[in-house]
Design a protein with these regions (language model features):
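Short glycine/threonine-rich loop-to-helix capping motif typified by GTGT followed
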Residues: 57-60, 87-103, 202-210
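Short helix-loop capping/hinge segments that flank enzyme active sites or metal/cofactor-binding pockets
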Residues: 27-49, 100-176, 181, 230-238
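A short helix-breaking turn/cap at a secondary-structure junction
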Residues: 1-60, 82, 136
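Solvent-exposed loop/turn segments at secondary-structure junctions
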Residues: 50-53, 81-85, 99, 109, ...
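Glycine-rich, small-residue loops and helix-cap segments
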Residues: 3, 7, 67, 148-241
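Acidic/polar loop patches that form or flank catalytic/metal-binding clefts of enzymes
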Residues: 3, 13-20, 73-80, 120-128, ...
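Short helix-loop-beta junction
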Residues: 57-75
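Short connector loops at secondary-structure junctions
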Residues: 73-94
Length: 241
């Protein structure tokens, strides 16, 4: 199932120019390579910088590592990744710049999605209209939390803005050439593994989300697909690898 999903994620999307950067895969391209002994001889790097946030999740990670080793994989442990600190300045903040990119792209993509809806009334709407609707119906739409992310995104300009382009180039270099690519090359790896995310957390209407740890950001910022398979459960909540 994960191989089929990865094939779709990495496949061609005519609405997404980024998918033109590589040859298109069909949903069955990767499935053909899923074999019972597929891990034998593969070098798997354990990304420890994306683990160590939750003891019970870490225990499941160790069990998964033992299982892969028993299946013939060569485990390369102790892989660490740190963001580059000198792309544009000594205090370069990759995650801050990545959030800046996210806000630009969220506004652009949401407006494009709305414009493509078949309902003409909805197709005329924009992020600005959604913000105003929420303000007009705050009691129903925002009883607990506000819409700060919407408002931050609305303040951004088009994707032709120099600030967006510079931020995108910087974060992709940090996550690609100086991140995933470098780790794979330096350690001669076939793949990197880490816990996907912590177990689900309780809803907190005062403090909001309480997410701790996870490995999705590096793949998301780089633009590479991130594949998750079940690793186990913690207190009945699923966690992935």
């Amino acid at each position: 199932d994960a191989a089929m999903m990865l094939g779709v994620m990495a496949g061609l999307d005519i609405a997404d120019p980024a998918t033109n950067e590589r040859p298109a895969w069909s949903p069955t391209t990767l499935v053909r390579h899923v074999q019972a002994d597929g891990l034998r001889g593969k070098r798997i790097g354990v990304l420890r910088s994306s683990a160590g946030f939750h003891g019970e999740v870490d225990q499941l990670l160790e069990e998964a590592i033992d299982s892969m080793r028993a299946s013939g994989a060569q485990i390369v442990d102790g892989i660490e990744w740190q963001t580059s600190q000198n792309l544009f300045a000594e205090s370069y903040d990759m995650f801050g710049q990545a959030y800046n990119v996210l806000l630009y792209e969220f506004k652009h993509d949401l407006n494009a999605y709305l414009a493509g809806l078949p309902n003409p009334d909805l197709a005329e709407m924009s992020l600005a209209d959604l913000i105003q609707f929420n303000r007009n119906h705050a009691d129903q739409e925002m009883p607990w939390f506000k819409q700060e992310i919407f408002e931050l995104a609305q303040a951004k300009g088009p994707l032709s803005d120099e600030n967006y382009i510079d931020a995108l180039v910087g974060v992709q270099k940090a996550a690609r050439e100086d991140g995933i690519d470098k780790l794979l090359i330096d350690h001669e790896l076939d793949a990197l593994i880490a816990p996907t995310a912590p177990p689900g957390w309780s809803i907190d209407l005062i403090n909001g989300d309480n997410s701790l740890g996870g490995s999705s950001s590096l793949a998301a910022i780089s633009g590479y697909p991130n594949m998750t398979v079940p690793m186990g459960q913690v207190h009945g909540m699923p966690v992935g690898l």
